């Protein structure tokens, strides 16, 4: 029997009087964490979680604007709710996140049926903003603000693995990226507040935490204090040591890293600290130094390769994942081929790929040397095929190995299988054998013998 723990949040928010809510989240892990926090606020206010988006009394879209396709998807979703609003005037429509920040009042002109538009920095102020809506106002909250600590318990989508934001915003100015203009300047949370949230997760039987930041290696640069060696007193490395002793937490992850700031000291900490998983997500974006310079990334391919070498020197079986952009303005066929070569040479476990998409208020969007759409599609197709092949080849190293898998639940497509992840973040499906006594709970770590390795997942059997 597979048992699931009950979270305290589920006990607290039983009585609801304000109707139901629905949240759809687009984009990154930061958005997912923000959505969990907003869901917690809504349930604290008295809303209950709807089971049908088209019957919810409050609909919130937490949006992404990193690519145009994500932006257009939001407008498509909004169209359905606008029709509902005309027949159900009491319906509250909220657009949060990066698109809300980017468009501001112009979004209200495009979709006048909206009740609330709020940028990412206002996530912790949702209750006050909705109170203004209840007074009959249409509210636009996109002004830059200090992100205060929120004492609301997030409504977690998982009962085992929790997202914990440790730094908001980004001070980098990559020429293609809209994030700094929509998420604002870097704001680090204090270590005590982060540890307190992780302790709360442990109290609620969570077993894994993922520390989040748009540029997580920048954590602590804006906090006071320096050591006698002259470095900042608070860094991601220091934070990992600080939270490592939280009882009940078995695994710690962090994302997303920037090669410009990824240090040997951090690598050493990951090697020394047992709970920190051997999984590193470090975007490289391009395999060509000239393109990296035009992107304003602040590092070279040679430096990136040294980082990977340093990781693998201490942790040979570590999982390395990355992001890559193809068809950046001016990218030649030769430069593009260097990106393919880098993927083959390093042997990534996985690479998240995208064709360049011009974003508002970014330098690269105004350059004349944009790549034709048909070339973008060809390059994206080719790189994706390479990534799939490379990932499948890389995953063969797990075959017949005994891997520790943290159980997250049942496979929604096959209830005869559990699913979980290895320390290296490989999604793993585990057969529930009828011939073996089975008595595990969500959050248990079990030994699994890997019997099948695909490009992006593994399968195996319980090993006793």
Swiss-Prot record:
- What PROSITE patterns does UniProt report for this protein, alphabetically? MTTASE_N, MTTASE_RADICAL, RADICAL_SAM, TRAM
Q: Which InterPro entries match?
A: Elp3/MiaA/NifB-like_rSAM (IPR006638), Methylthiotransferase (IPR005839), Methylthiotransferase_CS (IPR020612), Methylthiotransferase_N (IPR013848), Methylthiotransferase_N_sf (IPR038135), MiaB_methiolase (IPR006463), rSAM (IPR007197), rSAM_horseshoe (IPR023404)
Q: What is its EC number?
A: 2.8.4.3
Q: Which reaction does it catalyse?
A: N(6)-dimethylallyladenosine(37) in tRNA + (sulfur carrier)-SH + AH2 + 2 S-adenosyl-L-methionine = 2-methylsulfanyl-N(6)-dimethylallyladenosine(37) in tRNA + (sulfur carrier)-H + 5'-deoxyadenosine + L-methionine + A + S-adenosyl-L-homocysteine + 2 H(+)
A single GO CC term for this protein reads: cytoplasm
- Residues where [4Fe-4S] cluster 1 binds: 28, 64, 98
Which keywords, in A-to-Z order, does the entry hold?
4Fe-4S, Cytoplasm, Iron, Iron-sulfur, Metal-binding, S-adenosyl-L-methionine, Transferase, tRNA processing
Q: Which family does it belong to?
A: Belongs to the methylthiotransferase family. MiaB subfamily.
What protein is this chain from? tRNA-2-methylthio-N(6)-dimethylallyladenosine synthase
Q: Which organism is it from?
A: Prochlorococcus marinus subsp. pastoris (strain CCMP1986 / NIES-2087 / MED4)
